[in-house]
Amino acid sequence: MQKYAIERYEKIKDPLGERLVSGSDDLTMFMWQPKQGTKQIARLTGHQGIINHVAFSPDGFYLISASFDKSIKLWDGRSGKFLCLFRGHVQSVYQVAWSADSRMFVSASKDSTLKLWDLEKRKLMFDLPGHADEVYAVDWSPDGEKVASGSKDRMLRIWRN
């Protein structure tokens, strides 16, 4: 497993170096390149509510952010340029998780749903109701076949692809 992880890392390693994004309750995010010093390389703005979660795609090309403003934003993972807005949740979005192949992501929300999004088409693929309360956590299985979600309803659900 460790060998596979190292191979994947070497395959996608960016010649520009690793990047870090910090999200904040002042509605902004900053992109940094730690090896280049302490000055941020991009300021990412546009959310109208507190930013709850940010996640780079496994291939490093994209970044998504989830917010209390009920939206998900897609950004260029190298430059920080805004690319697309995803709307569909009716309450705050708490967390997002990428599929291993970077083609899809899933979002978890206060509205008790999960939503599966297609990156290429940039639209909602599936709405996954099933929890009785806010969904706080979501993640993909390493093989991409399942999604796990945890909710305030005290249920852990496993969704099959």
Indicate residue ranges for each PLM-predicted region.
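WD40-repeat beta-propellers
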Residues: 29-33, 72-75, 114-117, 138, ...
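Short coil/turn segments that connect the beta-strands within blades of beta-propeller domains
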Residues: 16-18, 59-61, 101-103, 143-145
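WD40/WD-repeat beta-propeller blade N-cap
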Residues: 5-6, 44-51, 86-93, 128-135
